[in-house]
């Protein structure tokens, strides 16, 4: 195999999906520890001590202890090169989180075993479903009193509609947590407290029968019964089913104590796919093609207070990036020279000399690049599957100075191109309605309108709870629909027709009465 193909085969590009506080940032830190990317793992919540999680680096994040922006971290592990895209887990997350999942080849789902499957996890799993992304699951926090592990598997299968294949099994929980049993290698790994900040060689015992004394007779007997149950009732791991997104291997442990993380990472690097082929409008692009192609899935503003810049995050789909190369911007038809592409280690910028399929690199963007833009070495190629997601929270924008209407509109359209929020212009009023996926987005937009566009605005409530993009192949039916529902219709920032529903019932009735109209919760960029 050539050096070029080896580089691609090594890459594993994935994101972590979880509900806020399920332990995602902690598990990220432990992975970086195993990848020698950091020396000691800083516990994330210990704000007073001044130890901040490596992956939470924007000022707002440092203040709140949450990850708002998507950082990208690259580190080596097990002969692979891991590209980990950290996604915001907090309530105040944005479409960025959803869109990041379009740039990965697999995902790690972290479940808080005390609480089980939660709302945010369900939403993120639905996004993974759009592309049948392979999912690995880590059941976290077994050093606490958790739910019954069989019940947890049942919940994942019923709510998330994916088969579970446990790879190991917890021995006890909470203060009686003794470790995990590897179901495929007949090996017990014993748990000890106090090793959360280091890589610790936890004791292993080959053969379940040999671990009887170490775990105690009562737990041993319970474990034997549970293992029989699990083997009878759960699914065997099947690599093909996993790669098709139908089955998830499940690992148990506690990220805070750095226990069970290594086993999960070993499994992940073994089974998760290398960079996959990608669909473009014109054809399917294979990862091992020689020419560079890729797409922008995120634009991040002001990543550096000193530079006041915007960075476009670019997923390489094929070929090799080399410093100083010229690339073709498909939407504008222009050539661009990329002299300073960046790679990130959560706020630590480094200039990158080369990049391969699966890698994420950053371009400086002076306003010409939008989310969803494709770049090639000359071929007219537009990648599919970088969606806009329907917002879930809406507010009316109130301008403090009416003379600044033009600046406000310009600012909102530019910020919506960046994916920060979406702006809607209703048919029957001059008001602008702003939509976002998380509450924090409204603060971010107001802050940036003031600092970058010199426009001060405030928000007030608006009678909108849902938005759906409208598509119809029959022009006459579409025009009839527009006349009949003009009070609910608006155009978004990119000029797409949108239905703004005051209630879920209103939307349902409109859908039932208009079977030829497509009401879509996503649209392509």
Swiss-Prot record:
One of its GO terms (biological process) is regulation of translational termination. Gene3D superfamilies: P-loop containing nucleotide triphosphate hydrolases, Peptide chain release factor 3, domain III, Translation factors. GO terms for molecular function: GTP binding; GTPase activity; guanosine tetraphosphate binding; translation release factor activity, codon nonspecific; translation release factor activity, codon specific. Transmembrane segments: none annotated. Residues 9-276 form the tr-type G domain. GTP binds at residues 18-25, 86-90, 140-143. The keyword Metal-binding does not apply. PROSITE patterns: G_TR_1, G_TR_2. Keywords: Cytoplasm, GTP-binding, Nucleotide-binding, Protein biosynthesis. GO terms for cellular component: cytosol. It is found in: Cytoplasm. HAMAP family: Rel_fac_3. Increases the formation of ribosomal termination complexes and stimulates activities of RF-1 and RF-2. It binds guanine nucleotides and has strong preference for UGA stop codons. It may interact directly with the ribosome. The stimulation of RF-1 and RF-2 is significantly reduced by GTP and GDP, but not by GMP. PANTHER family: PEPTIDE CHAIN RELEASE FACTOR RF3. Belongs to the TRAFAC class translation factor GTPase superfamily. Classic translation factor GTPase family. PrfC subfamily. This is Peptide chain release factor 3. It comes from Francisella tularensis subsp. novicida (strain U112). The lineage of its organism: Bacteria, Pseudomonadati, Pseudomonadota, Gammaproteobacteria, Thiotrichales.
């Amino acid at each position: 195999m050539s050096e070029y193909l080896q580089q691609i085969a090594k890459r594993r590009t994935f994101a972590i999906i979880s509900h806020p506080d399920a332990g995602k940032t902690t598990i990220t830190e432990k992975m970086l520890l195993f990848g020698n990317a950091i020396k000691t793992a800083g516990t994330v919540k210990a704000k007073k001590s001044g130890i901040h999680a490596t992956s939470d680096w924007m000022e707002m994040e440092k203040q709140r202890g949450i990850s708002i922006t998507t950082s990208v971290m690259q580190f080596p592990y097990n002969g692979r090169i891991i590209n980990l895209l950290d996604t915001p887990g907090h309530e105040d997350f944005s479409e960025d989180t959803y869109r990041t999942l379009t740039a990965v080849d697999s995902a790690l789902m972290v479940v808080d075993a005390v609480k089980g499957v939660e709302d945010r996890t369900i939403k993120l799993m639905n996004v993974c479903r759009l592309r049948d992304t392979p999912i690995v699951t880590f059941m976290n926090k077994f050093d606490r009193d958790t739910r019954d592990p069989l019940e947890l598997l049942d919940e994942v299968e019923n709510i998330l509609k994916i088969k579970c294949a446990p790879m190991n099994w917890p021995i006890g929980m909470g203060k009686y947590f003794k470790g995990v049993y590897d179901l495929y290698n007949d090996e017990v790994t014993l748990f000890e407290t106090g090793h959360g900040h280091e890589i610790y060689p936890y004791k292993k015992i080959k053969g379940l029968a040999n671990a009887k004394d170490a775990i105690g007779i009562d737990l041993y007997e319970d474990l034997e019964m549970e293992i029989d149950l699990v083997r009878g009732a759960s699914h065997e791991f099947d690599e093909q089913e996993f790669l098709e997104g139908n089955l998830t291997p499940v690992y148990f442990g506690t990220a805070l104590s750095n226990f069970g993380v290594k086993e999960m990472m070993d499994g992940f690097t073994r089974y998760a796919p290398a960079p996959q082929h990608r669909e473009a409008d014109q054809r399917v692009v294979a990862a091992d093609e020689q020419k560079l192609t890729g797409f922008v899935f995120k634009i991040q503003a002001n990543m550096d207070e000193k530079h006041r810049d915007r960075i476009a995050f670019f997923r390489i789909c094929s070929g090799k990036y080399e410093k100083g190369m010229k690339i073709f911007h498909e939407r504008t038809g222009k050539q661009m020279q990329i002299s300073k592409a960046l790679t990130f280690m959560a706020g630590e910028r480094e200039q990158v000399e080369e990049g391969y399929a699966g890698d994420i690199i950053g371009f400086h963007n002076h306003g010409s690049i939008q989310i969803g833009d494709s770049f090639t070495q000359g071929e007219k190629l537009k990648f599919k599957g970088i969606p806009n997601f329907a917002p879930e929270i809406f507010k009316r924008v109130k301008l403090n100075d009416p003379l600044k209407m033009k600046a406000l509109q310009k600012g909102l359209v530019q910020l919506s191109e960046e994916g920060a929020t979406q702006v809607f212009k209703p048919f029957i009023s001059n008001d602008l309605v702003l939509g976002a996926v998380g509450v924090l987005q409204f603060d971010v937009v107001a802050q940036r309108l003031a600092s970058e566009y010199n426009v001060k605005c405030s928000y007030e409530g608006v009678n909108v709870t849902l938005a759906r993009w409208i598509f119809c192949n029959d022009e006459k039916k579409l025009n009839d629909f527009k006349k009949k529902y003009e009070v609910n219709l608006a155009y978004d920032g990119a000029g797409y027709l949108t239905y703004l529903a005051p209630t879920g019932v209103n939307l349902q009735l409109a859908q039932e009465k208009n079977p030829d109209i497509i009401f879509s919760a996503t649209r392509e960029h």
